[in-house]
Amino acid sequence: MIDKLPLQSHYEARVEDLENSSELELAIHKYLSNQSICLKNLIDTCAWHETLMSAEKTVENWKYLLTLTLLNYCISNSGKELAAKVRLFEQKPWNQDSQYFRILVALNHALTKMSVPEVGISLLESGAALIDLQEYSSWQAFPYIPHHLEFGIYLSILVYLTKRDDLKKSLIRLGKWQLNTLDANYKPLTALFVREQNGDPEENLLLYYLFFHCLTAITEENEFISALEALSKQLKNRNYSKKIHPLWILIESFFKRLPEKTTFFTLPEHIYDPSTSLVGYRSSNGCTVCTLHGGRTGLGCIKLKDVEIVNFGPQYLPLSECLGFGIEGNHLSDHGLRKSIIELKKQGFSLKGCTRLVDQPSSSPFQIGLFRGIWLEVTQELVQDRLNLKTTFLGLDGWEGTAFSFFAKAEKCRIKGVKTLLPGTLDRYEGNAQQISLESKAASLNLNIPSFEGTVQVIPLAGKHDFWGANFLIAYILHSDQKNYHWQIEFSKENFMD
């Protein structure tokens, strides 16, 4: 019997009801229990499912095939029949310009003893991998979570199978960059470089753990082992409620050897990466991280003990949908007037530059978004116990129908002199701008805007799988007659820098 690892423990608790488990899940359950299994029927029935031009559905096809090829490899079966399936899948449309897809294809080749095509790993100077699932969209290539983590997981297996030093060096660089997306306690920054539809905190915590689990099996560096130990504890302490993809269970068991415990590695206080316009400061009490790059992602996040602003940035109305949330820009657009200027300070930083609001979503799912040409000049400055966020909106046709939103997580939200809201309730606030306090037991964050001519909406949320796990939405409705905005976010009760 293979020793129980965190994902296996969660997984087996979910597949106890074997009658409702798929044939593939039953096969993996037998493998983990050291029972004999036959994959013939699974291989025979493995087929490409229609994608309707969806990159995400194409990914699911390849991930299902990878689950089969990896399971087949683990039980030392001949890979001839599955190799034929790999060749059939390659004849279907898939984005050959995307290194995410290329590594999926290469891994299936390696596991079925076929010649392994070159992946052509492309990393930014900092070590971040460029992920672009959609074709002809290089300006949107970015280290999005969770695909960046999945890419690192696949790369770990490929390094193990091929023993290539160049791939191992790329993997280590990628892992060191991924540490930028963790706070000082190795907790993932829930919404950093994460689109809302991929923002389930449970699922992403699982992938963070699995990535560092794979990474430490390849290279036992102190910071990676410290990350794995912390993430493993976080996962064990979480009541994981969703179904786990069989592939992740299989990959966890593939790397059975656990690293030796090591001295805890303290992450650097400052986060600094010009290639992703990323800067931040983290301490044991909290973390503030800001960026001007992304694609339908936010401008940053703030954590102070048990209070968080998990994401903030511009978005189109209605507030109920996040398809129109966020900014767009990457290393290709970071030049000239859009060049980000980063300055590190003692226990702080400043970030200045220009970024663009994403295209306004179309009402039809098969049409591209409407280009509104709305730009933001942004200055984000962390000084002592305050983040100053200054924005200037620019656009020939104005910016009506937009808002600037803060997604927060706290025990309660107090609108000064008006009311106090609790998460998950139907009560809400809509009115003039007042000081807004996000409060929990150990800390609070105060949100002020000295001069604002529009209305503010404060809406309690469920705080589970949607909206990056936030339980409050604070939205400032913008109007074209005001272009300059200045928010002040103050840290209180416990000094952020202590």
Walk through the language-model features, giving the residues of each.
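Extracellular polysaccharide-recognition and catalytic grooves
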Residues: 64-73, 80, 84-276, 281
